[in-house]
Amino acid sequence: RFIIDDTDVENHRLSLFAVRSLLDPVRLAIPSLTRDQRRLDVRPPRDCWVRVENDRQRRYIRRGLNQNNGSTQRDCFILRRDGTIEGDIDWDYDTVTRVEARPMDERPLVLKGGVFTTTANRMKQTKGYNYWARNIAIHRSNTTVVGLTHHVVGETDTGHPYGGFLAVSSCANVTLRDCFVTGHKTYTTLG
């Protein structure tokens, strides 16, 4: 059993636990991509989770309340050792300005069990949001989480949103099986 008290926290942006690969990222040169492309002339030393970006193109621009300038165009996929692409490329990339390639661990990792109870934050802020981490961050491919339970207690009318207790990013083939996570209260600050 783990008790997480978020009523008085020094740094709410940090994860409590991190599951990471011990493999170092690799450098790949990918000058361009086309939508639905299925192969690259690149041969990584092992299968990799890859994210490509074109910072000259913006997507998902929001207008009106909470407007923003959108996000850099990006796609992620699995690049196999033989250069085949697994996953769909959604956009055309006349140029790729950034490539992130993370080798995928071949041996599966299984995390079993655990009951976590979070006493929710009560952070006050008049404008905008500060998303809280205070979670388990998974950045390792071929990982399975089985039988984890997360409860939230002590929510009030004041507080900030969480980014998710199980936060999976920059990896592939992650399975969450027989897990239970309590939803958090919704707060309505705009701006």
Model-predicted regions and their roles:
Residues R1-G191:
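Extracellular/periplasmic carbohydrate-active domains that bind, remodel
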